[in-house]
From Swiss-Prot, chains A, B, C, D:
It comes from the Archaea. It is an enzyme of class 4 (lyase). CDD domains: SDH_N_domain (cd12144). It catalyses: L-ornithine = L-proline + NH4(+). Its cofactor is NAD(+). Its EC number is 4.3.1.12. It comes from Archaeoglobus fulgidus (strain ATCC 49558 / DSM 4304 / JCM 9628 / NBRC 100126 / VC-16). Belongs to the AgrE/ArgZ ornithine cyclodeaminase family. Catalyzes the conversion of ornithine to proline, with the release of ammonia. The keyword Disulfide bond does not apply. Keywords: Lyase, NAD, Nucleotide-binding. NAD(+) binds at residues 233-234, 312, 344-347, 365, 388-389. Pfam families: ArgZ-like_C_1st, ArgZ-like_C_2nd, Saccharop_dh_N. This is Ornithine cyclodeaminase.
Length: 407, 407, 407, 407
């Protein structure tokens, strides 16, 4: 039997961390004895717990401690982080540490270094005295990579307490809730975040490209509510097809019915943009006169269009190498405080994987399974709305305008 | 080898009836020889076809003719319908004819009698020289029931030709179409139907009971757009809970968050209405002050609430015997020209089964599979919209008001 | 400021009860001070907590205590339950207590009476010194009904600890899990429950009626694994249609393709069973020779077929009054230890509402949203499997047979 | 008023081509007069129709003819195809012809050239006297590109007539059909296609990677039923994780429950394969010992893993540039007779876009909307099965083995 003392501090009960700790120990067939347990007597007091954890042997104990570590357990005697060299590019030393999406610190040179660019399923390297969270494919030979859990501290975000829609809905999906009220609450969150100088990214799928939703997103960009647009080839092509031909995938967007020969508009649009030298040039030349991409370019809102194997064309601005696209997305997301995901599972999951746990996310999709999947990131900073994005966006824009008018 | 001559008349090619006829013959391993085929030379000319159908033997030929009959084939020498007596209540003679939902005529006494109250999966009886379509459980001993296909003529509706949303979308589901445009087109259909004195039934599930959608439906009733409401216990209870407590299933409908103890409101509502002696009395006594049921009662719009095994209570007006409820629904639907089905699969399918094929139906649901199922009634008079009914209804009301203002 | 002392005992942290208690107090803007908190030092030790709860005034404090009560809080000075008379049939006294689905006790005559037939959203009456949980419509004038929370004690079930699929999956949906492994685990649960003399009810929708699934369910009944079948008219009609005509809804069940004229089989089946005098008589007369209903009758497994407004016919055994059906279902479910819900949302939710929280439930449906909805009963005794019931049942039967052979 | 004579030949009525022709003319507000209409008198006789089509003016007539052309209309006086030079790489001449996925011929030098590599939404270029169907991004400066519809002939496939599952289910989705019978029919199709020397490609998503389904797919590859595997990084990583760690996304695949620290296995797997130099090398070195990728390599079945922005790693064999991946997929699909799509929307749609209309496709997914979307390719050569791929694959393998044993 091997034993080790661990301690926890924070809103232990409120955030269910202590419950999870006991669960982990029992699920792994470990034992525990609680030495001390101080619950905060008042609302804002932190709690503190100290316990001895028992394992069958060193390996078993180590396994338990690894899991406890991930939810914030501290092993009182502070040790330096353990490092090992990467033997080749993209090749990692044995037992390398895999990151969570929570804020993380490593004990290095007697100090707690914050890990920069934290996001999940990556590794930590120390370069020039700073700790970076990087994907496998950016590891270069000789990189000093963190191995094991020693000297690594994870700080899961506390549950939001003040009265916001995130606090109320945090981590849940609203398929039974009144959609219009949810949209009002989200409009308020967006408005207040922008008031405080926050930054918002929009991740959008091609379903956004029907008249009213497209116009609403274009208006949100024009009015300064969007700081970054992440999407793919299809969204841009459909958006530009509307501007050039007045059709979306060959359908007249005003009458909502197919235009004869309209299916060709899709490829004709791509060809026109390629001939012009890209989206920006096509806007300069007056070929594209309105819409989502137009407003991005005119208002200097950066956009990243990542390629997929479904793409026709693609448009010149599309980044066809997915690893390059992913890297650019990661960089562009730095400093973003909220991400609004609109009707795209692939892009939303990809972006979700690149975000730290404290970035607020709002996921909107008609399919409840998609929303549930997107929400499953172990964070209270996400809300899911199961609704029709084609009606959601115009209403969101209207609600924001109403709030603007009132304040 | 047995042969028989059959003939078809109408928009044969356009409505794919001729294609189906050949399909049926070949699927059943029959043979055919076309004797005459006149295609209408202009848009509105009917076509005419005459052919010999071959079967291996009498039974095989009969089988083929049975199927051809259902899509409108006529066997030129006109025979009287064949009748047989029901040996006991609810017991049918062998080989009884099963109805489709298309307009149907029977040759009786040398005349073509229209079959009254036609709807699918029922039987035809002749009473006092008139032909009625009735369900099995209404057959009484001695009823003269139609057996076989002889002397029965089915007239499937032609595809709508003029430029309406039914012609355009007829029989299809709009999950990829711009929702807002669809709603506009539906608003126009409703407006024009009412202008011409048409009658509209609404079939609604409890998902309608969130503030804006509920208010929109109540307003549509108040403004005379609804002639009949078909629903269940839950819709009425939630609607009344909002009126009495301001909550829906215990959630504050303005703030969209649960009210402490709110889960009790559901049963308290039921209890209050029972104590008052029913919905109508509760409105008279001023207990219920607004909402869907309130507007129905105040505007003399009939409603039928059919019971289900999920019901709490139920409210006194709920018909707990499903066969009684079904019979009342069938009667109330007589003369209805359009049915709007809102977020309820059980009630929508039940109502769909009671309708002739020429009644227009609009099905709205968030789940594409539900809409597809509801559409599957062999008619071009149905359109399906995959969207959030909570946003659909307020927008529909708005669009109708815009049309009213313009005209 | 008003204050009251409350206490909790049990696996407080493990079952998250303490977390919920603090949540409730803070959500309602109350305050608390923890007086004592003893965490069980070992796995099986219960925990104990005592705290003072503060409210703004009596009403506010009462509101908080009501909510705490529902999760098991005790107010140390024990008071008798408060009763009030029902002024008329189905009419309840003000402030009546609404039940949860957890085991509940009331303090009456100085003793703790267990509330019989507990299930959610009902009321408690005291009759002849015993406490009964009954629906509103069974309340009769003069019944002594529990009002308020005083003297009522709710005991939410502890989370299952031993290594079963319920412990592992408890309260979760398996859309990402290996279906075959899940089925194996469920087969073992069923086998072991029956070994111990447990009783199993099956709730089944008509989707079960395709060859292999129907045969598997019939075999499970024959082999004694089913003690009660709850379903509707459609399941029975399709099952019997297969036995009489070899078709299901007109499709040849061996070749999987429609049989000419097969759509009539549905009504012909109903007519034959009505003519025979019901399902049992039709089996006696040799009209029905195999299948689900056949095995129920032959093996004396009771079945309840509840009517719905979609029903054709219906068959004579169908209970067309939903309140009567519900009452019979409630009675039949007494003593059942596990309920398997197969591809039917309406019946599954109805049955779920009739069950105490400690009855194990297994929900199988292709639609993840349906499963999620069915699981949402505040219990760890439920598991959901998102899969095709047509493949699930044959495999389940196979796995049970493999376990039988091994043991 | 402008007029032009057109003619049609083939199974016009049976394939609904004539119906569609009339629809097109009427939808575009054109007029027609039928000059001749000969229906095949016997089952296998082709039909022939000749009609005059009227348009308001040249442009209108041209528009109608364009649409008629796409469904196979011939304009009797045969003209050479019209060509125009591409002014720059990836830049197309005005009015370029956009391909369908049906077999297509162009009239060039007095002869009908078959268009090679036909698939939808591409362009046709003439190079060295041969006609090629290529995507926009492969057009090079100076390419002679087909413009307009003149001299282009499209031959939509006739509906399958012999009694196969494709004939029966062609173009439809089986959510109400008995799954087990469908699987049997598909097993027979696969077996017979391989007997005749046909080639089968499998497109698979990561949901396949649960024990039984993975083992079944591996066995199908080993037994020679798969000639090409198209997938992404995730499928390969999970498959290899099972081989190395016995877990899939950190879950024990035998017990179906998470393994402590198992979430790391995902990245550890990627790292091990990168370190080995790729999948093939890792198999050679004995690191990977079984599974889908193992069988591909051991049995020389080519595989293409296309990258996506969700990918971790990725594995060295993954093609991260989507346009390169797409081109390789197109090449590999040459000569494939059947494609089985398993639980992946992105890859299935991408592959569907690369296929000619006569390649048989079988789409399996749990989500009915996904299957419906995949089927929507205007072909009768597709069948969709809504079921659980985790149970589908083992059963499919079993059924194929049963057929093998019998024959």
């Amino acid at each position: 039997m091997k034993a080790r003392e661990v301690e926890f501090e924070g809103h232990l009960i409120d955030s269910m961390i202590f419950t999870k700790a006991l669960d982990i120990i029992l699920d792994l067939d470990g034992e525990f004895e609680i030495l001390e347990f101080r619950v905060g007597k008042k609302k804002d007091d932190p709690s503190y717990a100290r316990m001895i954890v028992f394992g069958r042997d060193d390996a078993h104990l180590e396994q338990i401690l690894k899991e406890l570590h991930k939810i914030g357990a501290r092993i009182p005697d502070i040790e330096e982080v353990e490092l090992a060299e990467a033997p080749a590019d993209k090749v990692l030393p044995d037992g390398f540490y895999v990151t969570t999406n929570h804020p993380t610190f490593v004990r290095y040179g007697g100090e707690w270094l914050p890990v920069e660019d934290i996001s999940m399923d990556r590794v930590i390297v120390i370069r020039d005295g700073r700790a970076y969270c990087i994907p496998i494919d950016e590891v270069v030979r000789g990189d000093r990579v963190v191995v094991g859990e020693k000297g690594v501290r994870v700080v899961p975000p506390e549950r939001p307490r003040k009265s916001t829609v995130f606090e109320f809905m945090g981590g849940r999906v609203s398929s039974e809730r009144p959609t219009e009220r949810m949209i009002e609450a989200i409009a308020r969150e967006i408005y207040e975040l922008k008031l405080k100088g926050g930054k918002i990214a929009v991740v959008a799928g091609p379903a956004v490209d029907h008249t009213s939703a497209r116009n609403a997103l274009a208006a949100l960009i024009r009015d300064g509510y969007v700081d970054l647009l992440l999407s793919g080839n299809a969204l841009a092509v459909h958006d530009i097809e509307i501007s050039i031909f007045g059709t979306s995938l060959g359908m007249d967007i005003c009458k909502g019915r197919p235009v004869p020969g309209g299916n060709r508009h899709h490829l004709y649009t791509i060809s026109k943009v390629i001939a012009a030298g890209g989206i920006k040039k096509a806007i300069e030349k007056g070929i594209i006169k309105d819409g989502i991409m137009y407003e991005c370019v005119k208002n200097n809102v950066p956009f990243i269009l990542a390629g997929s194997i479904r793409d026709d064309g693609p448009l010149p601005e599309v980044i066809t190498d997915v690893m390059v696209a992913k890297k650019k997305m990661k960089e562009a997301l730095r400093g973003i405080n909220m991400v609004i995901m609109l009707a795209t599972m692939l892009h939303s999951i990809a972006v979700g994987n690149l975000l730290p746990s404290y970035v607020k996310t709002i996921c909107v999709d008609m399919n409840p399974s998609t929303v549930t999947k997107l929400m499953d990131r172990g964070t209270h900073q996400a809300i899911g709305v199961v609704t029709d994005v084609g009606l959601f966006l115009p209403l969101l824009y209207l609600k924001i305008k109403e709030i603007e008018a009132k304040e």
